[in-house]
Amino acid sequence: MIARITKICLIICLLPNTLTANTKYFKQGIDLYKNKKFDEAKFKFEQDIVFNPKSEMSYLYLSKIFNNLNKKDLEEQNLNTVILLNPKNEEAIFLLTLLNIRQSDYSKSEKLINNFKKICKNLCKKEKELNSKLKNLQTK
């Protein structure tokens, strides 16, 4: 009985430390990203993912970092992870669509735009931008 109470007390004492470490890494990553310290920010977001593997925002920021570092494969991989975790993440769908347009992948871009139209709430104004870029791709 005493062993159980001791275990419960330890868990209660250690749990808040892991939760604060988790948000601490993400917040540090945001600050570093805003200061364009991409390598350091990347490390902080990866640390956040270790503590919270379903942190869609960490994956989203990693994709933005890889975009800035011109690592398109890693950008796409992280955007796909965000969409896997949250299929209604507008920003991830928007960024993945832009990436596919830049890669001249017409069919994927078209599917993503249609998906974007269905779930759009905050970034609906960006749909016109996507459609015009897709039309430019079509005329090439």
List where the protein language model places each region:
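Register position in tetratricopeptide repeats
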Residues: 34-35, 68-69, 102, 133-140
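Canonical positions in the second alpha-helix
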Residues: 48, 81-82, 115-116
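Canonical tetratricopeptide repeat
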Residues: 61, 95, 129-133
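Terminal, low-structured helical/coil segments at or just beyond the last alpha-helical repeat
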Residues: 110-140
